[in-house]
Amino acid sequence: MPDIAVWNKCDNRCVMCTNMTSFALQDSGQYRLKAQIEKMERYLKGLGRIYLKNPDKAGYVNLTGGEPTLHPDFFPLLAYFRRRLPGLPITLLSNGRRFADRKFAARFAAAARPPFGAAIALHGPNAKTHDPVAGVRGAFGQTVKGLQNLFELAPGLAIEIRIILHKKTIAALPATLKFLLEKFPDTSRYSVTLIHYEIEGMSETNHRSVGLKFAASSKVLAKALPLIRRFADLRLYHFPLCQVSPELRPLCRVTLPREDRVYPPVCSRCAVKRKCLGLMLEYFKKFGAAELKAIRK
């Protein structure tokens, strides 16, 4: 199932957002309830290429944005997707801020019938780090409160906390992990995903301020290994296996489609190529492949 852009507006202005500002300026009519239902019904009938991202992936669906929770018909839309996709895992990608409203969070908990998940982005251990990345003062407090409400009100919800790693967040990663362990000590209740940022949309526009090479991020990951080991379920996205320590390689996942990845010549000599992401195509264009080293068994 595809990634579905539920709504094109957002209440954050994240410096590394993969959308361009032009996305938010589109006519929102194409994202309203009636239009969303029509698109899904056409998709289910196999009537052409309806969704652009991951249209051929089976087994799950991601509800993305913008910020999906801002959709004026958010709850009717959730009910529709759950009814038309029974038994299919659905994941809501959100900044979590609207869940700071306890009534809203409770209503979501009732509507998000399993299998259902929420992937909430956290940009740091405090407002000083998180808010400048989110582009909104007060965002950190609302996101953390939103997470608290989801933990309390939605026991059947699969909660994932996503930390996007770039120049503005990488140094704070150990502190962010410590914050999570202290604030939400039952790590069996949620998963954590550390994602090396993708170079597209606003992250490309803001390349000077967010650009991060694997050589830098891998050093911080290695230092954070004792903290990483304390989480029941922690994963790494978008990392070539040769760029992380051997202890971290089992945590790496390949989540990008083949057309968004490349295997430079050095990869042909690598013993773990088949299990590896390679390089993100846009990363390769921006930074090249000099960092890569073939792993020998």
Language-model region placement:
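N-terminal [4Fe-4S]-dependent radical SAM core
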Residues: 1-3, 49-57, 247-254
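Canonical Radical SAM [4Fe-4S] cluster-binding loop centered on the CxxxCxxC motif
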Residues: 1-42
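Processing junctions and N-termini across compartments
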Residues: 4, 8-11, 236, 261-264
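A cross-taxonomic marker for long C-terminal extensions/tails that follow the last structured domain
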Residues: 17, 231, 236-240, 279-287
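Flexible mid-to-C-terminal extensions adjoining Fe-S/redox cofactors in radical SAM and related proteins
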Residues: 20, 24, 245-297
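Radical SAM enzyme [4Fe-4S]-AdoMet core and its adjacent flexible, acidic
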Residues: 26-30, 121, 128-148, 152-255, ...
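Radical SAM/AdoMet-radical enzyme domain recognition
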Residues: 41-62, 71-171, 181-192
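Active-site beta-strand/loop signature of hydrolases that rely on acidic residues for catalysis
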Residues: 65-66
